[in-house]
Amino acid sequence: VIGGGAERAEHELRRRAKLSLRNQLRTVRAALPASACDARSAEIAKRVLALPELERATTVLAFASIRNEVRTRPIIEAMHSAGKRVVLPRVVEDGLVLHLVEPGDELVDGAFSVPEPRREAPQIEPSEVEFALVPALAVDPRGYRIGYGGGYYDKLLPALRGARTCVLAYDFQLVAEVPELPFDAAVDLVVTDARVIRAVV
């Protein structure tokens, strides 16, 4: 709940700053050539697959990348090859539902044209997830992120109580500070094509 006038003004300033960053980095990322996305994504995949937190996990939440997002297919394939249970989100009216995906499972276009599991795929509770890969348009060293504005992951992250959470981002998406709002949730790790950050809030 937002209190007095000064607090409301601060909230509005942060909201506008966040929107500006979202639009700015969406534009920069959209201009990235496919070859650069592929090369940077390969570096990110190497770094994330070497994380001890991921190596220890047996059930991992991932996301199906679109357009110029960090390519997640090679990461998902590597996790399947390592015998991990891979989970993908499906958008529903009030948030995200998690489903198990097996190698070769066909994904369908869901909300916002994001590939997602079929509704018939086995459902997984957030409490079963041990490691989670999270998309972002921007992220800071504290683990606060800017998503696409729907708030889906801000609702999901608190439910992943037993999981280590990790944003995958290109290094130019790492900013000094994300103007967080009261309901924003931070992640534990940030992996870019240049570094691994274990977030400290």
Regions from the PLM with identified roles:
Residues 2-128:
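N-terminal active-site beta-alpha-beta segment that forms phosphate/nucleotide-binding
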